[in-house]
């Protein structure tokens, strides 16, 4: 839905986020400001590595095989598998029962290069001339069956599989691989490769010096709110009056000597229900807790009084968390 998370414009009177109380997009509640769906690129432009690379893998596969896939019929559908011609799409994520599920695409009876790929335990990634690149499926032995013969592949090595030339990349190696102008190139520094005009650019996020922030507690939180159910029978977000019961902190920092704040962020690691950050009394960022750090643009904070409010979370709140987050609050 969104490749890059975003932030809604500030409006003291009305939120642009979805809310159960509205007559339109009212399936759930969203924060007042943040509009981040854990997309490949986060709200402030940070790269979420897993969705970024796994989305890129399937986009590259569709670039090279999409025209063939488009002409194939849907053969079967089940809870975990979808078969379309020679492509099998697999997803074993089942909410609650198997939250750390996996997904992948493999070949089944695929005719190419004068041979038939009977099945694979590796994912197709891209084609470069007559060489087919695959990506390992972690936890599985990398094998390709061609014309009835099974070939066990060495990772990151080009080899023959019957009449076919193949190469199975390790998952980590694949994260550095980009097909540009018909060639497979590798990012040497763990960055992102792309073509800009007449050159290939590797963009790398470098670690900048950490600026320590001082956090001072101004007010302790009152008792956690009882989380009611909204119109759609899901947990309702807090109303403005609830934040009078939040824990309040001031945040101070020293950014002297820094002239550009575009790539400088405040990262807040907290546990609770909802967090809000104010600059000179104006709301600039908010967050429904999900176990991850909250990122705030320093450009919105510099030179202003910064205040953090955190609402505590009841352990029995009717909010859905995956098992990893549940363990953090129990």
PLM-predicted stretches and their roles:
Residues 300-312:
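Noncatalytic modules at the cell exterior or secretory-pathway interfaces
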Residues 223-249:
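Edge strands and adjacent loops of beta-rich recognition modules
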Residues 257-279, 287-288, 308-309:
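Aromatic-lined ligand-binding clefts that engage carbohydrates, nucleic acids, or primary amines
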Residues 2-213, 223, 243:
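Carbohydrate-binding surfaces of carbohydrate-active enzymes
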Residues 312-320:
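Short acidic/polar inter-strand loop motif in beta-rich domains
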Residues 285-293:
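A short acidic/small-residue loop/turn micro-motif
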Residues 251-253, 293-301:
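Exposed aromatic-hydrophobic patches
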């Amino acid at each position: 839905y969104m490749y890059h998370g975003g932030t809604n414009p500030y409006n003291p009177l009305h939120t642009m986020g979805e809310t159960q109380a509205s007559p339109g997009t009212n399936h759930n509640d969203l924060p007042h400001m943040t509009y981040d769906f854990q997309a490949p690129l986060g709200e402030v432009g940070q790269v979420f590595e897993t969705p970024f690379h796994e989305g890129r893998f399937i986009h590259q596969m569709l670039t090279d095989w999409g025209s063939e896939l488009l002409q194939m019929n849907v053969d079967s559908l089940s809870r975990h598998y979808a078969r379309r011609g020679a492509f099998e799409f697999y997803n074993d994520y089942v909410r609650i029962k198997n939250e750390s599920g996996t997904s992948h695409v493999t070949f089944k009876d695929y005719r190419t290069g004068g041979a038939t790929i009977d099945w694979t335990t590796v994912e197709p990634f891209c084609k470069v001339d007559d060489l087919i690149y695959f990506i390992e499926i972690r936890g599985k032995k990398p094998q390709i069956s061609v014309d009835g013969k099974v070939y066990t592949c060495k990772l990151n090595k080009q080899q023959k599989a019957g009449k076919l030339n193949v190469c199975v990349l390790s998952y980590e190696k694949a994260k550095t691989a980009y097909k540009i102008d018909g060639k497979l190139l590798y990012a040497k520094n763990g960055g992102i490769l792309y073509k800009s005009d007449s050159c290939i650019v590797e963009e790398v996020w470098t670690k900048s010096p950490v600026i320590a922030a001082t956090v001072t507690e101004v007010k302790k939180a009152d008792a956690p709110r009882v989380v009611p159910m909204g119109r759609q029978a899901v947990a309702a977000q807090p109303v403005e009056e609830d934040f009078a019961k939040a824990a309040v902190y001031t945040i101070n920092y020293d950014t002297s000597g820094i002239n550009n704040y575009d790539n400088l962020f405040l990262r807040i690691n907290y546990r609770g229900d909802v967090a809000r950050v104010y600059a000179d009394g104006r709301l600039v960022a908010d967050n429904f807790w999900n176990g991850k750090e909250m990122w705030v643009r320093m450009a919105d904070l510099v030179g202003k009084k910064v205040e953090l409010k955190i609402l505590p979370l009841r352990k029995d709140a009717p909010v859905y968390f995956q098992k990893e987050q549940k363990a953090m609050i129990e």
